[in-house]
Amino acid sequence: EYLLFDQTFNTGDNKLPAPRTCELLTSVAMHVEGNGDELMTRWQAFRPHYLKTDQYFDTTVRAGMAALKILEERRLAQPMGLRGNGKRNPYITDAWRSGETLKTIEATVDGLNQFFLPGLTTALEGKQEKHLAERIRNQFKEVQQNFPYAYHPMATALDEEDQFRVLQGLYVDISQLTILVNDQAAVALNVVRGFNSSDGD
């Protein structure tokens, strides 16, 4: 992202298509591709074992819960100034140089909707929690309806009040989804979340 989108770098002598920068970018891309292939290979080998473990269900649900909490707190609340010193700060978001922060948030929501939601709602329905399962489905739809209106760069969304209101709407929808999943669904499924489970420590 730095090589492609950093404004200061891309006004200097080493900006693309400078040969050394092209070489470095090619090496980085090949390294990322190699890591991705290696992760996929190892996951495919580990997957059958993982699916058979006693912890599979709880671990998977907690992973989805953690993703939602990180999305709500670190990727939205903190840069919006809703936590900490109360100042808006686009530079603590992912992909801020490229202006694609909110598209990465949409990708996270889409991934959870595609790969996490079906299993979660099936489990809830198995516990006679069909109403809760439907509420969660509907809330995912509410979150997704914020896009593409929320495609602005985070710096713009934080600086312009009309765009900030769009961002606030997205935050509220994600917060409501987090409550439904992390509080109500977790209780219904007897999934215990550890203290500070999304802190990464």
Tell where the protein language model's regions lie, with residue ranges.
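Mature extracytoplasmic or organellar-lumen-exposed domains after removal of signal/transit peptides
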Residues: 1-201
